[in-house]
């Protein structure tokens, strides 16, 4: 599982030029799954994200988590996080989980974040979306469950 986490002042998702979800501060998460991801992977990543200390304290050090600070989450499915561009000029997405599995895990991920007490807005799984993000910092962090659990 990969999550591109962006700390933001605001973020929104539009489908066919209509805003369907938006937040006014917190985290924008672009979320992708691979074949070997499981509900346990989802649980691990959700807990990791809500506990990450990526907001500044009064000393301007990243020392406060979203759980401590408060804020919303915009979660957007993003199978292209598993693009393989090692050969040729066209990306391959064979490392991405099949849509049915990915959608199940994506729904579970959003449920875990909601159960942790956050307002979670989402995109539309599998849809062509326009995502607008006003980064705060900017702070952008790539989380990869394979790298984190070694």
Swiss-Prot record:
Enzyme nomenclature, EC number: 3.1.1.96
Source species, domain of life: Bacteria
GO cellular component: cytoplasm
A GO biological process held by the record: D-amino acid catabolic process
Keyword RNA-binding applies: yes
InterPro entries according to UniProt: Daa-tRNA_deacyls_DTD, DTD-like_sf
Record's catalysed reaction(s): glycyl-tRNA(Ala) + H2O = tRNA(Ala) + glycine + H(+); a D-aminoacyl-tRNA + H2O = a tRNA + a D-alpha-amino acid + H(+)
Motif extent (Gly-cisPro motif, important for rejection of L-amino acids): 137-138
Protein localization: Cytoplasm
Keyword list, A-Z: Cytoplasm, Hydrolase, RNA-binding, tRNA-binding
Molecular function GO terms recorded: D-tyrosyl-tRNA(Tyr) deacylase activity; Gly-tRNA(Ala) deacylase activity; Ser(Gly)-tRNA(Ala) hydrolase activity; tRNA binding
Cross-referenced Gene3D superfamilies: D-tyrosyl-tRNA(Tyr) deacylase (3.50.80.10)
Comment block on domains: A Gly-cisPro motif from one monomer fits into the active site of the other monomer to allow specific chiral rejection of L-amino acids.
Family under the similarity heading: Belongs to the DTD family.
Stated role: An aminoacyl-tRNA editing enzyme that deacylates mischarged D-aminoacyl-tRNAs. Also deacylates mischarged glycyl-tRNA(Ala), protecting cells against glycine mischarging by AlaRS. Acts via tRNA-based rather than protein-based catalysis; rejects L-amino acids rather than detecting D-amino acids in the active site. By recycling D-aminoacyl-tRNA to D-amino acids and free tRNA molecules, this enzyme counteracts the toxicity associated with the formation of D-aminoacyl-tRNA entities in vivo and helps enforce protein L-homochirality.
Assembly notes: Homodimer.
Name of the protein: D-aminoacyl-tRNA deacylase
Species assigned in the record: Listeria monocytogenes serotype 4b (strain CLIP80459)
Name of the coding gene: dtd
């Amino acid at each position: 599982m990969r999550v591109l986490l962006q700390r933001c002042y605001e973020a929104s998702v539009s489908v066919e030029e209509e805003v369907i979800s938006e937040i006014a501060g917190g985290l924008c998460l672009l979320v992708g799954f691979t074949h070997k991801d499981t509900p346990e992977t989802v649980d691990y990543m959700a807990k990791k994200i809500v506990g990450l200390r990526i907001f500044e304290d009064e000393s301007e050090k990243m020392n406060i988590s979203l759980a401590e600070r408060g804020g919303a989450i915009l979660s957007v499915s993003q199978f292209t996080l598993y693009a393989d561009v090692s050969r040729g000029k066209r990306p391959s997405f064979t490392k991405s989980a099949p849509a049915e599995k990915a959608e199940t895990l994506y729904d579970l991920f959003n449920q875990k974040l909601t159960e942790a007490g956050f307002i979670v807005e989402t995109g539309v799984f599998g849809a062509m979306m326009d995502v607008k993000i006003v980064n705060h910092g900017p702070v952008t962090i790539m989380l990869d469950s394979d790298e984190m659990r070694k």
